[in-house]
């Protein structure tokens, strides 16, 4: 599995926990690592260069959570007849993360959208894939 795809999966898990628990995203990241590294000797410490840290996952989770209000407004403006709070939590966070990543402009939008659709196939359903594709396409086109 490609490293970036795995990082996106991990970021989605962190964002799901953050959204459901309303805890700070740093706490959700720490909880994720606690679960991932059940053996204390494998656990990353506070050093950013320690093996085992997933810097891309952390950047996606932190950046998405920091920009959530702006991103949510963009989602709402493109989703006709769908209030944000009525969207499934997984779908909402796939959208948030993809829109955040597109705003960074480091990865081509087509790649970000394809990755988001793959996450939707893994963690949601086919109806969600179509819905997410439509929203992301509309956001990308402006």
Question: Would you name each region that the model predicts?
Answer:
Residues 1-129, 133-142:
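N-terminal interaction/assembly modules
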